[in-house]
């Protein structure tokens, strides 16, 4: 089990949209949670049709990155909670400004849904 920080891009099994099988995909660590859990947002090669998608490219990484030939998208509306033991590997870390944009999008979504940030 590793230690992961906000802004880390890791590989972990997540479900997008709540249905179907979990699939190992890149996810951005938004923050650590209770009992060591991690709040993450999945990354996809296509933007979400039902929520906010934040584009990321190689220029958004402080270190490492994805094998990107085109933009990828952080799916802010599909956050999930995982355990550090679920992480299959670390791919890199996002720049602080990129992480801030993702958090801002998540806060807007929570306010629209009537939940406090």
Roles of regions detected by a PLM:
Residues 63-117:
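C-terminal terminal-subdomain/extension
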């Amino acid at each position: 089990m590793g230690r992961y920080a906000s802004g880390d891009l890791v590989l972990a099994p997540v479900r997008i949209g709540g249905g179907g099988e979990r699939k190992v995909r890149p996810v951005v660590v938004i923050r650590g949670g209770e009992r060591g859990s991690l709040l993450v947002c999945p990354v996809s090669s296509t933007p979400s049709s039902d929520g906010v998608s934040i584009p990321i490219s190689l220029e958004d990484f402080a270190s490492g990155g994805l094998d990107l030939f085109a933009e990828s998208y952080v799916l802010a509306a599909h956050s999930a909670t995982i355990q550090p033991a679920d992480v299959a590997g670390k791919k890199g870390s996002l720049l602080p400004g990129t992480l801030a944009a993702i958090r801002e999008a998540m806060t807007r979504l929570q306010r629209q849904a009537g939940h406090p940030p």
